[in-house]
């Protein structure tokens, strides 16, 4: 793309604009390539303006900056390079958001689950759908790992372009508060913006200085979308939609909502844990959700409300929710016996308490929790996780997680400090593969077993190296060896 064409996306100042073709947009000088435009971003730990010369020496054809920099190539000045990168990226990749329906989801909890519920419903209706979020970028059989829930705006545009080229009609995106703060989703309009809930999180450090800023960042989505889907049961919802510019559609248990949930009940059969509830208001039907926990009624109702606005048939909503699966989030793994085996990402005391409390409500014969703890992380997490599992599980199976540079036995010793505060039973099997084998071989009818900690991860980190370790593959290998 010609530089002059690219720059039509932003306001800028320059003595001259060379007649050059731009091969890529780059904001990390280490990734500069011949013919690229290097955009100087200020981050929490580094300032891209200091690396402009390095980028030019590696072949950058032009530097885009907020202030004059020393470089042997033309320098284009603009007021906010982070915002400029968003608009430049949209132009460079051909405005992919205008070629499909883009849905953004924000909230403290529930973004990932709601995103996958949306995907399951939309694909049940015959619409190819991509997802950008915590688990990475997913469309078709393609899964790309990412570092952040909401990637940098250049990556967001690149991934959306890939989705359009792959035939996606919809893109469902988790939109974090930091992503909004850093303009990672600027440069396009969301068709829908979904709000799940709001509670204290991400305060301090390089994130948000206080709750007011956190809420203000969340609220930005509702000035960037055409229609907002809002949980009116959340006491903070009025702050979230303050100064909104979109249409508002509401959901919740509150009878004044446009879409109302009621009559929820837990559903269980061997290998299946879920929840059933009724929807009234603008639609009237019953939904079965293939993810356990009454709190998932909110996530499902959010997805239902959004899909109704998109004119998706109720039958597709029902099919999608009944078959939804979120990798690593209370993910069921088919078993030959009359017990339930789940994989979950719970890796701290809060998330472990949530998942074990949820599963306890299904009245299992035994609730077995297999878990470890990350190495080179605060020891207090291990104490707390041991105490939570000891109090809530009938049996804890403690094993390795990502031990990193620590000895697994030292980590397990710390977990046992927490277990010792309870009357909970436990066994210790340091090898995670063997711990999984033990759980399967010793399962009894009616048991619920949760393998906690790894979730969607497909590796184990030991002594600085990541070794392949996908629990789904491990389980399949164990079952094959038992035949």
Residue ranges of predicted features:
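Phosphate-binding loop of NTP-binding sites
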Residues: 85-232, 236-246, 301, 362-363
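A short, gly/pro- and small-residue-rich
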Residues: 48-64, 75-84, 191-196, 212-216, ...
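Acidic, Mg2+-coordinating active-site environments of NTP-dependent enzymes
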Residues: 4, 9, 65, 69-72, ...
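ATP-dependent carboxylate-amine ligase
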Residues: 1-13, 34-37, 245, 282, ...
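A short acidic, helix-capping loop that chelates divalent metal ions and anchors anionic groups
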Residues: 71-72, 139-143, 200-206, 377, ...
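N-terminal leader/targeting and accessory segments in enzymes
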Residues: 1-87, 91, 223, 264, ...
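Short glycine-rich anion-binding loops that position phosphate/pyrophosphate groups of nucleotides
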Residues: 43-45, 177-178, 199-201, 234-235, ...
């Amino acid at each position: 793309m010609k530089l002059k064409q690219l720059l039509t996306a932003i306001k800028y100042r320059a003595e001259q604009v060379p007649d050059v073709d731009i091969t890529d947009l780059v904001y990390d000088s280490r990734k500069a390539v011949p013919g690229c435009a290097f955009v100087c971003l200020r981050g929490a730990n580094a300032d891209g303006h200091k690396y402009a010369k390095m980028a030019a020496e590696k072949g950058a054809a032009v530097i885009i900056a907020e202030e004059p920099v020393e470089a042997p190539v033309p320098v284009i000045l603009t007021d906010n390079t982070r915002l400029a990168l968003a608009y430049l990226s949209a132009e460079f990749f051909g405005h992919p958001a205008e070629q499909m329906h883009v849905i953004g989801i924000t909230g403290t909890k529930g973004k990932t689950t709601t995103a996958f519920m949306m995907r399951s419903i939309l694909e049940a209706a015959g619409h190819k759908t991509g997802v950008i979020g915590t688990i990475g970028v997913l469309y078709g059989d393609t899964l790309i790992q990412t570092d952040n829930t909401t990637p940098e705006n250049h990556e967001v545009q690149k991934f959306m372009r890939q989705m359009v080229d792959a035939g996606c009609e919809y893109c469902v995106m988790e939109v974090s508060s930091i992503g909004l703060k850093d303009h990672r989703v600027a440069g396009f309009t969301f068709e829908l913006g979904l709000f799940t809930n709001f509670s204290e999180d991400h305060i301090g450090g390089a994130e948000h200085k206080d709750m007011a800023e956190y809420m203000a960042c969340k609220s930005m989505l509702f000035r960037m979308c055409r229609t907002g889907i809002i949980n009116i049961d959340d006491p903070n919802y009025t702050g979230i939609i303050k100064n909104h510019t979109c249409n508002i559609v509401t959901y919740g248990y509150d009878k004044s909502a446009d879409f109302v949930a009621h009559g929820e009940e837990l559903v269980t059969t061997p290998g299946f844990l879920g929840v059933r509830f009724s929807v009234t208001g603008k639609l009237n039907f019953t939904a079965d959700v293939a993810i356990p926990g009454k709190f998932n009624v909110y996530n499902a109702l959010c997805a239902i409300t959004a899909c109704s606005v998109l004119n998706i048939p109720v039958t597709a909503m029902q099919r999608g929710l009944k078959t939804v699966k979120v990798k690593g989030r209370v993910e069921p793994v088919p078993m030959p016996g009359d017990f339930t085996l789940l994989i979950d990402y719970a890796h701290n005391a809060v998330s472990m308490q949530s998942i074990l409390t949820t599963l306890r409500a299904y009245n299992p014969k035994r609730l077995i929790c297999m878990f470890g703890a990350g190495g080179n992380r605060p020891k207090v997490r291990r104490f707390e996780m041991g105490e939570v599992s000891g109090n809530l599980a009938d049996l804890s199976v403690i094993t390795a997680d990502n031990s990193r540079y620590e000895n697994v036995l030292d980590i397990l010793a710390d977990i046992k400090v927490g277990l010792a505060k309870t009357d909970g039973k436990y066994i210790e099997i340091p090898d995670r593969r063997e711990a999984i084998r033990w759980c399967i071989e010793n399962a009894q009818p009616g048991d619920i077993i949760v393998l906690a900690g790894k979730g969607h991860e497909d590796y184990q980190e030991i002594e600085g190296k990541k070794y392949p370790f996908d629990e789904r593959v491990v389980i399949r290998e164990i079952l094959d060896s038992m035949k």
